[in-house]
Regions:
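Glycine-biased, small-residue-rich flexible motifs in mid-sequence functional cores and linkers
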Residues: 2-16, 86, 92-275
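Short, small/acidic-rich helices and loops at N termini and domain boundaries
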Residues: 2-98, 266
Length: 275
């Protein structure tokens, strides 16, 4: 896959069939990412899984979900996503692509399709996640900057969530060296969030990589950010959590990383602080 990736205009018929099947599974009511990934693993692709829906029971997926797929109730929302991706000529990575990241593919609820902007070669780089507080101390920011800079210089892509605070420090420190950073969005690939993040988004698109599993045009929704955290950890060999609050997305990422058999490291805040 080249730097520009598999944009809509360059998808062949087989890829478009796989993409449509991936959307069918994504939008099939009651199926979920875990079952969709199980089907793709069992049958070899999303397209093969859709064609073999009468055999879903063999893959451990409820036959009622196959019946739901057969109703076609998913077609409206799938078509909306298809059209939006076509309209923006989105760069699309499919489960069947040889450049789909091996680490990400290994997680139990790996996305069947995601969208990208930037340097797709980073998908083949070893990744390490740096996440943490939006209101980090000077010490926390310094640690995140130092670790991100050093790891990036060693050829490791720094993975984070494009939020303010530690996320932004990690991305900027990685890009300042050799441009090895991946930002995982909780919005559509074409949606800027936070609104004041334009400079960071531009830098990531030019020198790093942005990815999102959500349909183009998806606006910020609180429930989507914890969902994307499994991809942050899934792309990474390990996760460094810097000064995370007791109830935070960073600790969700840490828990998911442990479930994915990743290494987890922590930099706590001051002893009497909540982080």
């Amino acid at each position: 896959m080249t730097r520009q990736g598999r944009s809509w205009a360059f998808m062949d018929e087989a890829a478009r069939k796989e993409y449509w099947a991936s959307l069918a599974l994504r939008h099939c009511r009651g199926l979920g990412a875990r079952s969709a990934a199980r089907l793709a693993r069992y049958f070899g692709s999303a397209y093969a899984a859709v064609q073999a829906r009468s055999q879903w029971g063999e893959a451990g997926v409820n036959k009622a979900q196959a019946a739901e797929l057969a109703t076609g109730s998913w077609r409206v929302t799938a078509r909306e996503e298809w059209d939006r991706a076509r309209d923006i000529s989105a760069t699309i990575v499919l489960w069947t692509d040889p450049d789909y990241p091996t680490l990400l593919r290994s997680i139990i609820d790996a996305p069947l399709v995601f969208y990208c902007r930037g340097d797709l070669s980073l998908l083949q780089s070893p990744g390490f996640a740096v996440v943490g507080s939006r209101k980090a101390t000077r010490h926390g920011r310094s640690v995140a900057e130092y670790m991100s800079r050093c790891l990036s210089a060693c050829g490791i892509a720094i993975v984070s969530g494009m939020a303010l605070g530690i996320d932004r420090v990690a991305h900027e420190a990685a890009l300042a060296r050799v441009g090895r950073s991946i930002g995982v969005l909780g919005t559509g690939i074409d949606v800027l969030y936070p609104p004041d993040n334009m400079a960071a988004f531009d830098a990531m698109e030019r020198h790093g990589l942005l990815i999102s599993e959500f349909a183009p045009g998806t606006v910020p929704h609180a429930g989507n950010f914890p969902i994307r955290n499994r991809i942050i950890s899934g792309l990474s060999l390990g996760v460094l959590v810097v000064e995370a609050a007791q109830r935070s997305g960073s600790l969700i990422t840490a828990r998911l990383a442990l479930e994915q058999n990743r290494e987890v490291y922590a930099v706590p805040g001051p002893a009497l602080d909540a982080h």
